Structures are given as structure tokens and as C-alpha cells.
């Protein structure tokens, strides 16, 4: 069968669908990822065929502009009229899908061009979650930003999804929908690849702590959340790996000797065997840490991050710093908290027992064949 994946051109929306896409390919199906701009190449680097539905798009600049306008408008965490680049992808992708004719479309919650194409060509469509905070209301809100595209392409209404795929751990899932079948799937992190380097080997006599604000938040909000790294990281009894993209370092000052600054690393590799992870609360970071059984400190500010932080804290897998921020004493205590480690390892075991992407791919093919 031909499987079309919608991969919106942002890391947090594209990368989570690539593991399932690879599973379909390994199972012998023809897979195509639809993305845009530089993210078309990012998907191709995963060994997949890609259609660039928005050539030349600078989605990161577009997202920064949207966030700046949202803050000026004082609309809080509401989406506003923002399609997460489905509008920019719509015309090219509708035309392409018309002659490529996929048998199944899979989209993440904000890849709302997927249902439009499904409705136009009467193709089964499935939504794959990428985190905890997805609701039908949320998807409908983003879909409203495609009103003009629905009109341009003579599509009257969104179709009903054949199923939803839930990638969250069973004991933490809060997913609710309008009655579509929910298929559980093990979250298998995809963070890109890299060539092994000697410094990846951790010292056996020292703890390892990862710190990241993800790919979007530093560009939009700066580095205030991790000012403690510059001010007092030397008082933390650990080797600290600080992940900040090269384009988001303008506020960075000198760093203590126990901090290693990196641009891009395969996060799943570094979390295996780490002692803790401090991050902004993005769904990818949250689920990758849960998959590895690593305790977390989650800031949880903006977008879906408060939801991610809350479920981590309620399950006992991490803590939320609150308004007081972080101190070296708090971080040292966190690194030695055995109850956080125990709960995190329990969740990792839950996730390992869930159906893997290959099994889910086979189940979806069966559903399509049965009609």
C-alpha cells in the first residue's frame, strides 16, 4: 500500500511520526513524507522519500513571527489563525496526492492538511498523537485556519478519523476523543543520527545530567530558564550536557568547566544511562525521557508543556520547579532521589510492553483492508 505521512515543518511535529513511517517501509509498503523547506531534507535523512510541499519555506522564522504576534495580541496560549504551515503546504500537496493516490494518510495533531486531502480523495485517515495534550477541540481550532484552503479545493467538511494512535504510557494517558478507536503504540524516539564520539562515554564515578530547552523555545523566549547553568552549575555534582542550538546562543555567557555545550545530539542515546534530564517540557523530550526511564525536571511553560509537566509530576517521574526556579541544592537532591528513578523505570517498562510501531502498522493495514 501507499502511505502518506504529513510531517509539518517543525521538529516536534515531524520527528515523532518518522518511527511509524519507517515501520511501514520495513513492512514492505511505499511510504512518503510530506513536509516543507529544510524539513523535507530532515525527513529524507531518516531514509524516507519526501515530497517538499512548501519549497523555500523558512518555518522557524515563520514560527518566531507567529509567536511574536501572539504575544502582542495577548491571546495567551491560544493558537490564533495559525495552521502550523498546513496552509503553505496545501496547494502543492493536494495536487500531488491527486496523482500519487495514497491508500492511507497519517497526520500528527497539528498536521491538519491531512484530513483535507483525505476528504477530497476519500482516503482513510489516522491521527498519531505526539504527546499528552491533544483534544478534538485543539485539532478543530487549528483546522479553522484552513478555511480558505477547504474552499479553494472544494472540500466541504473534515472526515472522521479511522483511528487515533496514542503514544503515551498507559498509566499516564489522558487522551479523549469523539469516539474514534484508540490504538496504543510504544513511543520510539527518533532524534536523528550522529557519528559516535569518545566523549559520549560517561565517567563511571560521576553523574550525568542533560539540559535542553528544545528547538523552539530558545528562539522565541531566550535562555532565562537556564540562567542557573551559567551562574551555579559548578556547584552541581554532575557532568552537565547542555543542548542549545547554534542559532539560539546570543544570551549565553561563559560556562563552568563541568558543562559541555552541544548543538545537536541524538537525545535518546544520551538519556540511556543518564541520571536526570532538565527540559522545557516539550512532548518529544518528555516522552524520550520516559522511554529511557530517566527522572525529569520539567519547566512546563507555554503550548502543551504545562500538561506534559503535570502528568510527569503526578506519576512521580519528575518535578516542576515553580516560580522559585532552580538552585544547585535542588538539582543535587533531584539527582539522588530514588523514588523518582523508581517511578520512571516503572513507566519505561510499561512503554516497552506496548505494541511497537511495526505491530501498529500491520494493524492499520488490516483496518484499511476491512474498510
From Swiss-Prot:
It is an enzyme of class 2 (transferase). Keywords: Cytoplasm, Enterobactin biosynthesis, Glycosyltransferase, Transferase. Its main location: cytoplasm. The keyword Transferase applies. It is found in: Cytoplasm. Its EC number is 2.4.1.369. InterPro entries: EryCIII-like_C, EryCIII-like_N, Glycosyltransferase_28, UDP_glucos_trans. It holds the Pfam family EryCIII-like_C. Pathway: Siderophore biosynthesis; enterobactin biosynthesis. It comes from the Bacteria. Changing residue 264 to L: Convert 55% of Ent to MGE (45%) and DGE (10%). One of its GO terms (molecular function) is UDP-glycosyltransferase activity. It catalyses: enterobactin + UDP-alpha-D-glucose = monoglucosyl-enterobactin + UDP; monoglucosyl-enterobactin + UDP-alpha-D-glucose = diglucosyl-enterobactin + UDP + H(+); diglucosyl-enterobactin + UDP-alpha-D-glucose = triglucosyl-enterobactin + UDP + H(+). One of its GO terms (cellular component) is cytoplasm. Gene3D superfamilies: Glycogen Phosphorylase B (3.40.50.2000). GO terms for biological process: enterobactin biosynthetic process. The keyword Lipid metabolism does not apply. Catalyzes the successive monoglucosylation, diglucosylation and triglucosylation of enterobactin (Ent). Transfers glucosyl groups from uridine-5'-diphosphoglucose (UDP-Glc) to C5 of one, two or three of the 2,3-dihydroxybenzoyl (DHB) units of Ent to yield monoglucosyl-C-Ent (MGE), diglucosyl-C-Ent (DGE) and triglucosyl-C-Ent (TGE). Glucosylation decreases the membrane affinity of Ent and increases the iron acquisition rate. Belongs to the glycosyltransferase 28 family. This is Enterobactin C-glucosyltransferase. The lineage of its organism: Bacteria, Pseudomonadati, Pseudomonadota, Gammaproteobacteria, Enterobacterales.
Amino acid at each position: 500500500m501507499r502511505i502518506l505521512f504529513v510531517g509539518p515543518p517543525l521538529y516536534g511535529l515531524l520527528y515523532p511520526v518518522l518511527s511509524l513511517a519507517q515501520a511501514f517501509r520495513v513492512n514492505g509498503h511505499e511510504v512518503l513524507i510530506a513536509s516543507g523547506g529544510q524539513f523535507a531534507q530532515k525527513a529524507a535523512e531518516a531514509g524516507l522519500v519526501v515530497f517538499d510541499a512548501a519549497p523555500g519555506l523558512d518555518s522557524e522564522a515563520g514560527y518566531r513571527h507567529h509567536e511574536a504576534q501572539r504575544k502582542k495580541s495577548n491571546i495567551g496560549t491560544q493558537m490564533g489563525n495559525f495552521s502550523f504551515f498546513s496552509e503553505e503546504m496545501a496547494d502543492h500537496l493536494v495536487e500531488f496526492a491527486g496523482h500519487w493516490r495514497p491508500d492511507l494518510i497519517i497526520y500528527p495533531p497539528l498536521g491538519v492538511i491531512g484530513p483535507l486531502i483525505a476528504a477530497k480523495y476519500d482516503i482513510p485517515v489516522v491521527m498519531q498523537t505526539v504527546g499528552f495534550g491533544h483534544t478534538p477541540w485543539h485539532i478543530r481550532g487549528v483546522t479553522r485556519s484552513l478555511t480558505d484552503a477547504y474552499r479553494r479545493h472544494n472540500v466541504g467538511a473534515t472526515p472522521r478519523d479511522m483511528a487515533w494512535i496514542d503514544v503515551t504510557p498507559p498509566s499516564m494517558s489522558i487522551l479523549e476523543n469523539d469516539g474514534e478507536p484508540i490504538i496504543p503504540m510504544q513511543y520510539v524516539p527518533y532524534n536523528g543520527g550522529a557519528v559516535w564520539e569518545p566523549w559520549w562515554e560517561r565517567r563511571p564515578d560521576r553523574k550525568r545530567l542533560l539540559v535542553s530547552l528544545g528547538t523552539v523555545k530558545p528562539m522565541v523566549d531566550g535562555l532565562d530558564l537556564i540562567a542557573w547553568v551559567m551562574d551555579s552549575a559548578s556547584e552541581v555534582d554532575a557532568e552537565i550536557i547542555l543542548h542549545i542550538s547554534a542559532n539560539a546562543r546570543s544570551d549565553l555567557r561563559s560556562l563552568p568547566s563541568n558543562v559541555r555545550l552541544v548543538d545537536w545530539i541524538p537525545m535518546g542515546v544520551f538519556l540511556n544511562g543518564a541520571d536526570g534530564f532538565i527540559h522545557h517540557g516539550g512532548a518529544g523530550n518528555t516522552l524520550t525521557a520516559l522511554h529511557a526511564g530517566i527522572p525529569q525536571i520539567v519547566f512546563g511553560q507555554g503550548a502543551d508543556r504545562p500538561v506534559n509537566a503535570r502528568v510527569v509530576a503526578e506519576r512521580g517521574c519528575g518535578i516542576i520547579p515553580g516560580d522559585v526556579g532552580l538552585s544547585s541544592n535542588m538539582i543535587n537532591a533531584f539527582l539522588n532521589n530514588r523514588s523518582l528513578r523508581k517511578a520512571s523505570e516503572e513507566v519505561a517498562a510499561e512503554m516497552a510492553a506496548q505494541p511497537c510501531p511495526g505491530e501498529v502498522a500491520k494493524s492499520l493495514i488490516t483496518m484499511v483492508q476491512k474498510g
